[in-house]
Structures are given as C-alpha cells and as structure tokens.
Amino acid sequence: MTLHAYLGRAGTGKSTKMLTEIKQKMKADPLGDPIILIAPTQSTFQLEQAFVNDPELNGSLRTEVLHFERLSHRIFQEVGSYSEQKLSKAATEMMIYNIVQEQQKYLKLYQSQAKYYGFSEKLTEQIQDFKKYAVTPEHLEHFIADKNMQTRTKNKLEDIALIYREFEQRIQNEFITGEDSLQYFIDCMPKSEWLKRADIYIDGFHNFSTIEYLIIKGLIKYAKSVTIILTTDGNHDQFSLFRKPSEVLRHIEEIANELNISIERQYFNQLYRFNNQDLKHLEQEFDVLQINRVACQGHINILESATMREEINEIARRIIVDIRDKQLRYQDIAILYRDESYAYLFDSILPLYNIPYNIDTKRSMTHHPVMEMIRSLIEVIQSNWQVNPMLRLLKTDVLTASYLKSAYLVDLLENFVLERGIYGKRWLDDELFNVEHFSKMGRKAHKLTEDERNTFEQVVKLKKDVIDKILHFEKQMSQAETVKDFATAFYESMEYFELPNQLMTERDELDLNGNHEKAEEIDQIWNGLIQILDDLVLVFGDEPMSMERFLEVFDIGLEQLEFVMIPQTLDQVSIGTMDLAKVDNKQHVFLVGMNDGTMPQPVTASSLITDEEKKYFEQQANVELSPTSDILQMDEAFVCYIAMTRARQDVTFSYSLMGSSGDDKEISPFLNQIQSLFNQLEITNIPQYHEVNPLSLMQHAKQTKITLFEALRAWLYDEIVADSWLDAYQVIRDSDHLNQGLDYLMSALTFDNETVKLGETLSKDLYGKEINASVSRFEGYQQCPFKHYASHGLKLNERTKYELQNFDLGDIFHSVLKYISERINGDFKQLDLKKIRQLTNEALEEILPKVQFNLLNSSAYYRYLSRRIGAIVETTLSALKYQGTYSKFMPKHFETSFRRKPRTNDELIAQTLTTTQGIPINIRGQIDRIDTYTKNDTSFVNIIDYKSSEGSATLDLTKVYYGMQMQMMTYMDIVLQNKQRLGLTDIVKPGGLLYFHVHEPRIKFKSWSDIDEDKLEQDLIKKFKLSGLVNADQTVIDALDIRLEPKFTSDIVPVGLNKDGSLSKRGSQVADEATIYKFIQHNKENFIETASNIMDGHTEVAPLKYKQKLPCAFCSYQSVCHVDGMIDSKRYRTVDETINPIEAIQNININDEFGGEQ
C-alpha cells in the first residue's frame, strides 16, 4: 500500500503526468492488474475519450474510469452486494414526505411547514447531508440530551432527529440509500482481491465529504497504490487561494498518519498548459499581494455589454471568428457561466448562428407537455375539478392530439368555460354544454351558421372525450386502497388513454425527422414515469393510503425527474457552470456573466440548520458537516481561478451592465484585479467597438441581415452610419444565396403602423347600407377611428369572463332603479326607510339571478358583493327621496328606449339623419330617467342619467362641442322630438341635462370629534348632488330646488344664487335656452360628420389626446393596433382645449326645428 500525491497549481501537468503514467502501464501490459481512475461524474466521459482517442491504445480492458458510486458497484460485482433494495432520489423524497405527513402532529417547530412540498425536500437534503458526514440519529439525540441550547434550535434538531430516526427504521433491513451503499462499500473493501491488485488514481476533486474520506482511507489501506491529484501549492493558510484543496491534503495527511504510511509528494511547478505569456502571468499573479504588471499580448479580453443578450450575441460572433479565421473546432471552445439566466440565452441565441453546443446541466421534466398533463390530471382530482388545472390539462394537447386543430377547439372551449363559470362537477353537466349555448358566447343574440355549429359540436365532443378519460381515471383511483393498487390503476389509466402508443409514435416521427434530442426526451419521460410508479410500489407496496395522499406523494416523485441528455455530436461547444463543469485544455474559454454578485456571489445558508447552529454542533459533537457559507465565500476566488485556467490559448471575460430583470449590474471585482495585472488590458465596450469596426458585426449571414436592418433604420433617421453597411446591403441584395428575407426586412424599415383606408364597397359590406348605432359607438369613433373599426367593422370581442365587470355593475343599478321607480311611479319622496329596504330586496331578488348566469350567487365573495350593491341602492334611494322632496320636477319615464321605428308605444322615435354619402343614420339608445314639470302650458324636461363611475358623471361642454360626449344632447333632442308620445304640452323646453352618481359615499374626518350626525347626513347628500347643465330660465331654476333664495347654493342641483338673487358663477352650471339648442344642433352635425367619416373608410390609429390623456389607457384593442408613441405620436389628434365652449357655440345657426332660425 503506497500513497502518492501530485501537487501543483493549475496547468502544471499533473493530470497529464497521471494519464501518461497510466498509458505506459497499459502499453507495457494491456491485461495487467487493474487501473482505476476515480473522477467526478461530469468528468468521466472526457477522461474515457482520452484513452479511446489515443491511436496507440484504442481503448482498454485494464483501465476503468469510475466515480465513487460506480466503483462501489464494481466491488459489489466481485464480493456480492447488499440484499436491500436501493432507494432512488425520488423514492427517498417520497418516503420522507409521507413520514413527515404521518409525524406532523409530533413536530415542535415545523408542524405548520410540514404540509408544504418544499419542506420535505429541504429535510431530505439535510438527512442526506448528515449521512454524507456520518452523523446518525443517535448522534443527534445524544447531542440534544447532553447540551443546553436555545429552545428553537433544540426543537429544530428534535424534529429533524424524529424524521431521521423514523426514516432509518423504515428502511432498516429492507432498503438502502446511496450514502448507506457507500458505507457498505467501505465494509466490503477487505474482501476484494481485485481491489488489492489495483492502482488507484483520484483526479478532478477539490473537496470530499466524510464518507468519501472513509472510502479514500479504505482504498489507501487495501489497494496496491493510490495516487491523488490536487490543484494546490501546499499552502495550508485558511485565507490562501488554495484553501479548499489544501484542506483535502490535510485530511489525506491525517489518514496517512492513522495508517502509519508516508505520502510520496511530487510537486509540479512548470507551467505546460498555457501557450502564451498572458495566460501564464494570469495564473501566477492572480493571488499575489505585490502586483507585477506586464504588457498584455492580446490573449486575454474583457468585454462590456449593455445587456445579457447583447453579451451572448457577441460571444457567438467571436466563436464564428475562431472557427473561420483561427481554424479551431467547436470542441476547442468552452463557455462557462454562473447566472442561470444565461442558460436560456444560449438556447435562444446560439442556434441562430448555427453553433452546435451542449449544456452540461440537468433540466427538470416538469414543464414537458406529458408531465404537465399528468400533474394537471392529478390537480384536477385534488382540486375537485377546478377550472385552472382543467384548462392546463386540455392545453397540453396530450389527451386531444387526435383532433384536427385541437388547440383552436380548446381555445373555444376555454372561452365558453370562462364565460359560464364552469368548475367542479358542472363539467359533467351535458346540458351546460349544449351546442345552442355556444351561440351566445360573447354575443347577446347570434344564430349559428352551419360551419359554426360543426365546429362547436367538435368542441363538445373533444370535451366529452377528455371528461370520459378523467372520469375513468378517477373511478380507477377511487377503487384502489393500497399504494400498489393506485400505481396499477394509474398505469392502466395511461394505457386507457393510449399514452404509450401515442408517445412511441411521436418518438419515431421525431427520430425520422432528425430531431433526436426531442425523441430522447420522450423516452426519458416515459421511463421516468414508470420508474416513479416502480418506486412507489417498492417503497410502499401494499400499504393502505388515501387517494389524496397517494397523489401528493406521486407528485413529489414527478418533481424529481430530470432530463439527462447525451451530447448529440463530438464537435460542439462545451457549456457548463463555473462550479461544476469540467473543461480542460480548451483553446478558447469564454467566462460570461462576470458581474459582482455572480463572481463572487454572496453565499447564504439554505439548509434547515443555520451556519451558527452548524458550527455549534461541530464544536460540541466533535463531528464535521458540510462547509458553512462563510467558508464557501472564501473559496469564490478559487472558483474563478479554476475557471479561467482551463484555456490553453485565449480567455475572454464578459459582463453586462443590466440584468435579466432590468436591474443595474456592476463589474466583478475579480476583473478589476485581473486588469491590474496587465498594461494595456482595456475593457472593450461592445457597442463602441462595433461602431468603430462595423465589419465585426458581419459574421453570420442571417444575423448580419438583422443588424443591417438596424443600421439602415438609423440611416433613415439621419444618423451617421458606416459606408460598410450600404456596401453590405448591395452585396446581400445582389446575392441569390443571401437575399432571402431581405425584402421583408426592407418593408419593415418604412413601417409606421399606418392602416389602409377602406373602399366604398368594403365599408358598406362591413357597416351596412345604413348605420344603426348607439351614441357610445360614435363617441368611440371620436376616441380613435381604429377602435371603431376593430369593434364594429372587424367585430372583435374581448373574451367574456365569469366575473363582474364595471359595466355589469352599471346595468344592475339601472335595472334596480327602474324596477323601484316603476313600482312607486317615480314618487321618491314618499319612501321611508322600511319601504326602501323592502323595495331594494324585492328588486335584487328579481334582477341579480339574471346577471351573468347567476354569477352573484356563485361564491361567498359575490354574495357579499350583492349585499354591498343593496347597501348602495338603499343609500341612493335615500338621496333620491331627499332630492324629490325639494324639486317640482317629477320622474315620469324610466329606461325609455328610442329608435327609428319604435317597437312599442312606450318607445320614442329617433329622427333619421343622413351622411354626406346619403346613407341613413339611425340612432338608438335608452334614457335612464325623464323628469317633467309643467307651468303655464309649457313643459320642461330634465334628462337624468345614472352613472356608477365618478369619472363619467360629469358633463364637459368642451367634449360636447368636439363630439367626444354626445349622450346628453342626443337624449334631450330625442325627448324634444317626442312631446306627444311623452304626453307633454305643445310647448316643451329643456330643463336640465344632469348626471346622478350611483355610489356609496366615503366621508373623511380629521378626528373623531369632528363627527356630527346632522353634518354627516348633509355631507352624504352633497355627494349625490346632480352635475351637468341647467337651463338658466327662471322657471326652471325655481322648479329645480324650491329652497333657492339669495346667498343659497343648492345641494341637489348645480345652481346657486348671489346676494342679489342672480346666478352664482361659481356654484352654477347654466346656459340659456338658445345655447342649449345650439349645442343640440351642433351635436347632430357631429353625428353626421362622424358617420360620414366612418363610411369614408377611415381606420387610422389616431387616438384623440385630451387633457394629456389618451383613450389607449382603457382600450382593449392595443394588442391589435400596436399603438406606439414612438411611431404613432405624429397621428395623435388634439383639440383646442382653451376654448370657451359656450362662446364657441354661438356661431351655430338653429333651424326651424327649435322654433325658427336664430
């Protein structure tokens, strides 16, 4: 038994010496005693290639490259293995989760956390950590019993010890964990004759766990020889760069002392790896205190990018340069990263440059459609058929793959389900999914066409097929009692779904099309699923378990599944993390993401046991645990050192100034340290570099076209652009090989989001030969022509959801107030509190069930909202009573409809207008309330409009003037046209155009002492004060509020009097009768102008900006019009907001309709 240690800094030939030594032994005696090379898992393939690719060897029967676990299996093959079943990672996790749930009531600290999946994962990691460092439950229990400690720490350790002991008891004599198998391996070593003849080499490690040190001790004791290779200069200082490997050397020395053998050290001081002085100087001077600056020869580069995406694009371009100009192969290049955000960027950017690569990392299977289907299926059962997991299940397209356009059918089903509030067992109600119900989806009245009917029948059939599969699954699972029964039921359900055949067919198609990686994913998905089922049966067998617990445990197992992808080719760029990737002797290594916070990154304790608790336990129990965060923090420089010394020829460091979430980032302090080692090592700012060297952007044909587009766009905006881009454009344009897609890019240069004006025929096809429209439609056009085109031309509708919208609330208030008003004939002043409550309850019972398929009775929240609506109605009726008490105007008509041809005697006639093209304009709508007052054979009318939103309960005469607010003038015009149908006198004049805000007022007080019941009632009444415009006629003023007198301001209408009895300018919103008529006439002209523009085919993305606000903020069509302030601001429309609308309207002439031209 001999022990050798090869010690030296990076690149000094330690591993080369080891490989040479092994190869010499193999050549001398190919069938001699075994040679074992122990390396980390991620290094074994690379080392095997070193032997396979040697032309003098072409492989080996004598040498094996193994990691510790594989070595243990090799010994077990010789001496016999354990009788227990080995637990996989997933099986261990599932068992511990189940134990935690069973023992939850006995936990002291973690009782509330036990129900969360993440807790069992943390607990599993902690138990595995204890096993790696040979800490048993007995160690924990003795420590807890013997030591005085904080209550929280004691409770924590007791909880962990409880689960740990229970776990050990469960697996005793039946199962074995990976860590326990290594202990068994140690016990088997003395029996192995093969091991006694073996030469052992250990390379690629920088630290070991306690159990691994015990294995090394056994190897030293029983093998013929052991050689360990460590990257260290032998300095044992805890602040040394090589603290971590020097700690390993110290442990090896202790083992040697215990075994009473000496270590034959061989120091390697000569640098062999690096081909130039730059890399040699970087390695030698990285950790020195006194810096020796030398001139940089260009083999070290530091790149600064604005964003991470720009950073990886530049790395891709430089890889192409290495391949094309330096004749490197892809396998000569490596990229090392630390920030996980870069993994996504590699997948999205490198394929654009046709760069083959392999990322040495495991990806979770949880987001694969098959796995998402299974997990959603589980959640459907767990959640009692809630809508979200059901929709996720449908959208995976796994159970619906047999349907043509299945994604479209699922989208239609989703729309219907969200509109009708389908959840729970309502999914099983076939009546709810009657095809006729789909006709009303998003539309109040619509008859299905034959194509639509066929489509919706397919939707219903698809839904039924999926429901049948879920019901079969639920039935099979509900009949099971033991875990084995559940696993069997699950597998049989998958066969019932025909999932195995479906997956194998898809796998074969992918293989046939050359997509081998995706095909391999399907294989691994299915094998992983079967493995989890096998693990469940192995661990729990015939143990009784509830279906709920089984599905929880099963889901825990699925969480552990990961893809392990084999490289698809040998010649590819190696990508890995700086901490784990094993890339040696690459010609060029790129270290990306070299930012402060990433390199070095702050190390924080993430285990259940804190660093302080860990240190206390180590000191008091005389054991060693995994390194604490402060120790790991000291090793950050070593991580950087190892990463940057992997290259032979060139090292490129890069960093970005902005993170993936838009946060600012700083350069790594290690880069400042590296820069200080060299003269003339400047940081290259990528945008500035490309500005000076535009040709450096032209490395890949497809990406060059994209960059060319950006350059030409800058040129169009009169920015200075290098002539090289104009030359590049001509070359690409004239090359049949390169110009594919160029026309499309060029068309984007002049894109300004401009719509096409509709022709006369198309306008009539879209809008009809006459315009039948509400006032709001015209107001919508004034907001933005494209909004009108999208809503009434293309008839685009937002998806209706089973939730109360603002307009629903307004409809409810209108319906309730109409119901009550008709019951009392508009005489609000007769109401008392008891009558208000009675009528409110009656109205709500009648109206609420009709809202959104009885939405307001669907949940506790909506039932609470119903009560709130009732409270608002009661408060509103109290205000209406107050207003009716002091007004001579009487409410006479409620929710009165108007149209060109009334359907009943109660409806009003709307005069037809005509566009400039001769197309009729038929306006329709509904007036909330019409109040009347008659004196001396003259009738005065008030238009009252209920608004549930404060913002819309204001009459802005400037908006009225410009046609942005047309409602009130239109309603007054309709009433004045229908005096006979309303039963009014021959002479009818406007009274007021008023808004009533339906709401629940909030009164603010500075302190409790300010609260006075009388004042509170007054303040509440003021919150319901009508707003709008009132006829300045004295008869109207007197009738609106009978209390009006000098120095009095009404609290029910916008009218106030000065001391002399004149109208107050501050407290009054009034206009004379002629002015009101002029506004009405101008409103008609606005209708004609707007309708004419519609029929002219205007569809511009041209929102009307008013008071610095755009209607786009509340528009649902932004995803269609793509309005962009950078492109469309020149088309924003504005109006002169400084005008006095009452003065401006005086230029309008009034025709005979209002009593002669004025």
From Swiss-Prot:
Pfam families associated with the record: ADDB_N, PDDEXK_1, UvrD_C
UniProt keyword Metal-binding present: yes
Name under which the protein is recorded: ATP-dependent helicase/deoxyribonuclease subunit B
Record NCBIfam families: addB_Gpos
Biological role: The heterodimer acts as both an ATP-dependent DNA helicase and an ATP-dependent, dual-direction single-stranded exonuclease. Recognizes the chi site generating a DNA molecule suitable for the initiation of homologous recombination. The AddB subunit has 5' -> 3' nuclease activity but not helicase activity.
Enzyme Commission number: 3.1.-.-
Keyword tags: 4Fe-4S, ATP-binding, DNA damage, DNA repair, DNA-binding, Exonuclease, Helicase, Hydrolase, Iron, Iron-sulfur, Metal-binding, Nuclease, Nucleotide-binding
Co-factor: note: Binds 1 [4Fe-4S] cluster.
Quaternary structure note: Heterodimer of AddA and AddB.
Other comment: Despite having conserved helicase domains, this subunit does not have helicase activity.
Binding site for ATP: 8-15
Family in the record: Belongs to the helicase family. AddB/RexB type 1 subfamily.
Example of a GO biological process term: double-strand break repair via homologous recombination
Gene3D superfamilies the record matches: 3.90.320.10, P-loop containing nucleotide triphosphate hydrolases
Sample GO molecular function, one term: 4 iron, 4 sulfur cluster binding
Domain (UvrD-like helicase ATP-binding): residue spans on this chain: 1-275
Enzyme class: hydrolase
The gene coding this protein: addB
Binding residue positions for [4Fe-4S] cluster: 784, 1112, 1115, 1121
